[in-house]
Amino acid sequence: MSRIGKKPISVPSGVTATVEGQLVKAKGPKGELSYIVNDEVLVKFEGNVISVSPRDQSKDARSKWGMSRSMIENIFCGVKNGFEKKLEINGVGYRAALQGKDVQLSLGFSHDVIYKVPPGITVTVPKPTEIVISGIDKQQVGQVAAEIREYRRPEPYKGKGVKHADECIFRKEGKKK
């Protein structure tokens, strides 16, 4: 039995939710999101509480039960508060700057990397070595952060590269003479 899936989801204040078959819609102060729940999972909306349960006891239905509950909770949290990821840039001459809506990254290549920000995502650069990505869709915010990090992953010897603010880089010692 899923420990996450069996918890009911209460709709936060300021958010309106509708359930139409397998489609869950949420509208809040930050915007509107929807999620199509897998056919293996049942969604019930009673009062101000949404409960999720598997249609049958098959392994496939039970494996998607907890994930469906988490996804529904994430859309409620996203339309109410939004999500944010911070990236840090370490390295001599490594920096970021906004160029219109796009992000210009100087990461030691012979050319600057221009990252086109998808719609629904806001990117700010408070310092040249810090990038803040925010939006209402948790998956999309994480995807943008991962794509920017992928241009120059942190290396283990000097720690140069783009890393998440809360990420700890395992450092290695150089060759001994």
Curated annotation (Swiss-Prot):
Keywords: Ribonucleoprotein, Ribosomal protein, RNA-binding, rRNA-binding. InterPro entries: Ribosomal_uL6-like, Ribosomal_uL6-like_a/b-dom_sf, Ribosomal_uL6_a/b-dom, Ribosomal_uL6_bac-type, Ribosomal_uL6_CS. PROSITE patterns: RIBOSOMAL_L6_1. One of its GO terms (cellular component) is cytosolic large ribosomal subunit. GO terms for biological process: cytoplasmic translation. GO terms for molecular function: rRNA binding; structural constituent of ribosome. SUPFAM superfamilies: Ribosomal protein L6. It comes from the Bacteria. This protein binds to the 23S rRNA, and is important in its secondary structure. It is located near the subunit interface in the base of the L7/L12 stalk, and near the tRNA binding site of the peptidyltransferase center. Part of the 50S ribosomal subunit. HAMAP family: Ribosomal_uL6_B. Belongs to the universal ribosomal protein uL6 family. This is Large ribosomal subunit protein uL6. It comes from Bartonella quintana (strain Toulouse) (Rochalimaea quintana).
